[in-house]
Curated annotation (Swiss-Prot):
GO cellular component: cytoplasm; nucleus
Subunit (UniProt): Component of the CCR4-NOT complex, at least composed of CRR4 and CAF1 proteins.
Biased composition (Polar residues): 96-106, 116-133, 415-431, 503-525, 534-545
Molecular function (Gene Ontology), one example: poly(A)-specific ribonuclease activity
UniProt keyword list: Cytoplasm, Exonuclease, Hydrolase, Magnesium, Metal-binding, Nuclease, Nucleus, Repeat, RNA-binding, Transcription, Transcription regulation
Protein source organism: Arabidopsis thaliana (Mouse-ear cress)
Reaction(s) catalysed (UniProt annotation): Exonucleolytic cleavage of poly(A) to 5'-AMP
Protein name per the record: Carbon catabolite repressor protein 4 homolog 6
EC number, as in UniProt: 3.1.13.4
The keyword RNA-binding is annotated on this UniProt entry: yes
Described function: Acts as a catalytic component of the CCR4-NOT core complex, which in the nucleus seems to be a general transcription factor, and in the cytoplasm the major mRNA deadenylase involved in mRNA turnover.
Stretch list, region Disordered: 34-65, 85-176, 404-431, 494-558
Keyword Ribonucleoprotein: no
InterPro entries referenced in this protein's UniProt entry, alphabetically: CCR4/nocturin_mRNA_transcr, Endo/exonu/phosph_ase_sf, Endo/exonuclease/phosphatase
């Protein structure tokens, strides 16, 4: 009993000692720092603790120990002790899911990542063995190899093509001399706001009202003007001058403005960069003071301030430095009326003579002439400017501007039949018959100078009363469009009129329909005044039977086309004291209506009086005017004839049939070779003005000696403009396009310090 107790005690002690000996290092390795040396609860006197910290024995034992691995170690030690085996620590198999302990000398190779993880985890110069890399994409960059961009995964993007209306600079073949001072000049008819509204039904009805509003168009115009970045800008049809001046003031421009005389509220304006030029002289021409209608022109002298040593953002010096240049800038909007070549010539002649005088006053400063000239390239008026001389002998007065070759574009009936259907209905709600529409169209044309040649392609003829009243931008082009279905094309021109009991429009209502608005357009007032001046009262009351086809016919003579219509209507009128026949109608056109007649008609229109009797108009005619009409009843109209007064208007001398000027002028666009689809055979733009009833060229920039053309802004191709029925568009803010030229001062014109 005692022996067994002793053996048990010895075995227990040995076991405890062995267990303590074996578990001591395990205890030491496994115990966390706060519990090192503590005795844990458990069987026997040996303390036990638990830890999941990995440990690497410094003595070389690399046993991987977990929190409960010492149970197996004690069991194995007791088993080997019982069988007399020497002590050897057992190394349990390594758990492949466990991470190895940190060792700076340990080379750890993780398993190869999945195929989709190559680019994210793969390290430089470390490739797992026995792997196939053919299917794996290469890494984007290696430290030991040259970098190359990754291959494009998508198709190669093509270069963005330029829009069809993109405008590029076109350069002259001869560049200016090095060091020449250059400046950019612009000419632009920006379309007056009130004209756009007044002519919306005839010229711009395809354009939404909001896009035709001044706010919308102003933003487009200001953006475009800023884009071209001209140093000098000559603008026509400017009625919102204060708005435009404020916008351009923030962009460094100063400006002057001259409003037209008469009832119009638009005019011409000249802008210039304040840090490039300063204004040294200014004057304007009011042509009405010379008996040349209500158009105006501007003349100013600008002196350069920006030298090669001055930056554009610097304030210019108050006084000009030695070697500065001066330039005379002229801006004009010529009368529209295509048959009044005498007034057109008179206006241009007056401006050129005045510009030459101003140039002489300022030491022969070179001249730049900009504007809307309402004449076609190579017309007699164009040739007068370029060739310095024009002979009126044998030249028809209505052929001076070349507008007989203008292209008018009558609106298609389907575009507005529904829109204007209510305007063409009678009071009983029935649509007016064709003959009434024809009569209405003729009454719309009651102010037309019946001496106008039937082949004139003015916008007045096909586009009804609104254009008949005159849109001065409508003038010239190269082609002639057919005048078919003109009766339906002109329906919208009679929308505010009602037939009388006889089915015809009354004379009183017809006259009231010709009332000039309080804010009369420049086009409208110019053309109306032209037309009022060019016809007598009797002719105004006798041509309402003319048909649109006769107006548009390019092959019929004007007298024969109207003669069959005059007698019937004259009989209906029964005007006492007036003896009218065909020649009478055409005779009073030119000389019967003087300034007194214009004053009378202006008052009549302004008062808006409804005349109830057809004879009231005659009773109000001044005696002098009436007698002139009666005395001329036997004169037959000839479009080639010139009265002494008309010759004096054109040439300045009633005894002289030639008109001359002293300036050597060149059109800047004709000096620069351009694309075939943007230029005509003369080098001028194919189109500078485009709306519903016209497409052609009327705008120019001219330069005198002392200046050299460097480059011009290419016009918009005609095909690119024809995608829309007419301008303005959501992109372009006017029915004209801007002409821009860069000019250089010639060294011979360098001025000494004054």
């Amino acid at each position: 009993m005692r022996r067994s107790r002793f053996v048990a005690q010895v075995f227990s002690d040995v076991t405890f000692a062995d267990a303590s000996t074996i578990s001591a290092p395990i205890f030491t390795m496994s115990t966390r720092a706060p519990y090192r040396g503590a005795r844990g609860r458990g069987r026997g006197r040996g303390g036990r603790s638990f830890s999941d910290r990995p440990y690497n024995d410094d003595a070389g034992r690399d046993q991987f120990v977990t929190g409960d691995s010492h149970f197996q170690s004690v069991h194995d030690a007791n088993f080997r002790f019982r069988h007399g085996e020497p002590y050897r620590q057992h190394q349990p198999p390594l758990d492949q899911r466990q991470q190895p302990p940190f060792n700076q000398n340990y080379e750890f190779r993780p398993p190869p990542p999945s195929r989709g993880q190559w680019q994210q985890f793969r390290q430089p110069n470390q490739f797992p063995s026995n792997q196939n890399y053919a299917a794996c994409p290469p890494p984007p960059f290696y430290q030991n190899q040259m970098s190359r961009p990754p291959p494009q995964q998508s198709f190669r993007q093509r270069p963005r093509s330029k829009p069809s209306d993109y405008r590029e600079w076109e350069y002259a073949k001869t560049p200016p001399s090095p060091g020449s001072e250059k400046f950019v000049v612009l000419s632009y008819n920006i379309l007056a706001d009130y004209l756009a509204n007044d002519h919306w039904r005839s010229l711009y009805f395809h354009i939404p009202r909001n896009m035709l509003s001044w706010g919308w168009r102003k933003s487009k115009l200001v953006f475009e003007l800023s884009l071209w970045s001209a140093d000098i800008m000559c603008l026509q049809e400017v009625d919102k001058f204060q708005d435009l001046e404020e916008e351009m003031k923030h962009r460094g421009y100063s400006a002057i403005w001259k409003m037209r005389t008469g009832n119009a509220v638009d005019g011409c304006a000249i802008f210039w960069r304040s840090n490039r030029f300063k204004l040294v002289h200014e004057e304007s021409i009011q042509f009405n003071q010379l008996g040349l209608r209500d158009n105006v022109a501007q003349i100013c002298v600008l002196e350069t301030l920006l030298t090669s040593h001055t930056k554009e953002n610097e304030t210019p010096p108050p006084e000009s430095s030695a070697g500065s240049h001066r330039v005379v800038i002229c801006n004009i909007h010529v009368l529209f009326n295509p048959k009044r070549g005498d007034f057109k010539l008179g206006q241009v002649r007056t401006l050129l003579d005045k510009a030459h005088a101003v140039s002489k006053l300022w030491d022969d400063a070179p001249i730049v002439l900009c504007g809307d000239f309402n004449c076609t390239p190579k017309s007699p008026l164009y040739n007068f400017i370029s060739d310095r001389k024009l002979d009126l002998s044998g030249l028809a007065r209505d052929k001076v501007s070349g507008q007989v070759s203008a292209e008018f574009r009558p609106p298609r009936p389907e575009n507005y039949t529904t829109r204007y259907q209510s305007a063409n209905k009678s009071p009983q709600g029935q649509v007016q018959p064709p003959n009434l529409i024809t009569n209405a169209h003729m009454e719309n044309n009651s102010n037309i100078d019946v001496g106008t040649a039937p082949s004139e392609k003015t916008s007045e003829l096909p586009c009804g009363d609104t254009i008949l009243a005159g849109h001065e931008a409508t003038s010239s082009s190269d082609q002639v469009l057919p005048c078919e279905n003109m009766a339906s094309d002109c329906q919208f021109g009679i929308e505010n009129r009602k037939p009388d009991d006889s089915g015809n429009l009354s004379t009183a209502e017809d006259l009231s329909s010709l009332t000039i608005s309080d804010t009369e357009p420049q086009h409208a007032s110019s053309a109306r005044e032209d037309l009022n001046t060019d016809r007598s009262v009797s002719s105004g009351l006798s041509e309402t039977e003319q048909t649109p086809e006769e107006i548009c016919s390019s092959d019929q003579d004007i007298s024969s086309s109207l003669s069959t219509k005059v007698d019937t209507f004259v009989a209906e009128m029964k005007l006492d004291g007036l003896k009218l026949d065909e020649p009478v109608v055409f005779a009073q056109d030119e000389e019967s209506l003087g300034e007194d007649g214009e004053t009378f008609l202006a008052k009549l229109h302004d008062n808006n009086e409804n005349l109830s009797q057809k004879g009231e108009l005659v009773s109000e005619v001044p005696l002098k005017w009436s007698s002139e009409a009666l005395n001329s009843d036997k004169i037959t109209y000839s479009p080639s004839s010139w009265t002494p007064m008309e010759i004096a208007t054109a040439t300045g001398d009633p005894e002289r049939t030639t008109v001359e000027h002293a300036l050597e002028l060149k059109s800047t666009y004709s000096e620069v070779e351009g694309q075939a689809n943007t230029r005509d055979e003369n080098g001028e733009p194919v189109v500078t003005s485009y709306h519903r009833c016209f497409m052609g060229t009327v705008d120019y920039i001219w330069r005198s000696e002392g200046l050299q053309t460097v480059r011009v802004l290419a016009p918009i191709p005609k095909q690119a403009m024809q995608w829309t029925p007419g301008f303005p568009t959501p992109k372009w803010g006017s029915d004209h396009i801007a002409l821009v030229s860069e000019l250089a001062f010639c060294s011979s014109k360098t001025l000494p310090k004054s």
